């Protein structure tokens, strides 16, 4: 069994957050090593300006210095980025270079499935379309992640 923990609190959106509130939600590099030693988790999900859900029109303003500091404090523990749906190739590549090994893209997968089901028709045919659409998202993401490494 692999255990992943998120250190920090990932918001559902960024709008309406002041800098102080936003910083308070982010992973604190100063406590990463102690947290990992205490919990012995297999992977660490970080909060560096990423949010759950889709980004409206542009990449999020990720705190790259914070991510680099977390990477240094985490040692060989793999880093995870929740809220990675819709990130550009530039951001994916930069995150990989900073040690992110796993990206959660649930919003993109659900959007693909929803679009397939919205076409209507037989439920089994819709399920097959949804599965195919999600497989297409997975394939595109694997190619993007591979290109970023």
Each model region followed by its residue ranges:
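P-loop/Walker A phosphate-binding loop and immediately adjacent motor/lid segment at beta-alpha junctions
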Residues: 76-77, 123
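Glycine-rich beta-to-alpha transition loops that act as phosphate-gripper elements at the mouths
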Residues: 78-87
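C-terminal alpha-helical cap/extension of soluble enzyme domains
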Residues: 87-149
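Alpha/beta enzyme core
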Residues: 1-75, 89, 93-98, 105, ...
């Amino acid at each position: 069994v692999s255990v992943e923990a998120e250190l920090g609190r990932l918001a559902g959106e960024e709008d309406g957050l002041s800098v102080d509130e936003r910083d308070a939600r982010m992973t604190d590099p100063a406590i990463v090593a102690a947290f990992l030693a205490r919990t012995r988790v297999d992977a660490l999900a970080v909060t560096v300006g990423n949010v759950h859900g889709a980004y409206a029109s542009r990449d999020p303003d990720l705190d790259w210095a914070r991510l680099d500091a977390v990477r240094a404090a985490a040692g060989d523990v793999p880093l995870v980025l929740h809220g990675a749906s819709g990130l550009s190739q530039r951001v994916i590549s930069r995150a990989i270079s900073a040690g992110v090994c796993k990206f959660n893209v649930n919003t993109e997968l659900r959007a693909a499935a929803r679009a397939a089901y919205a076409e209507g028709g037989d439920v089994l045919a819709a399920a097959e379309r949804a599965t195919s659409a999600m497989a297409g998202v997975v394939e595109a993401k694997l190619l993007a992640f591979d290109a970023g490494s």
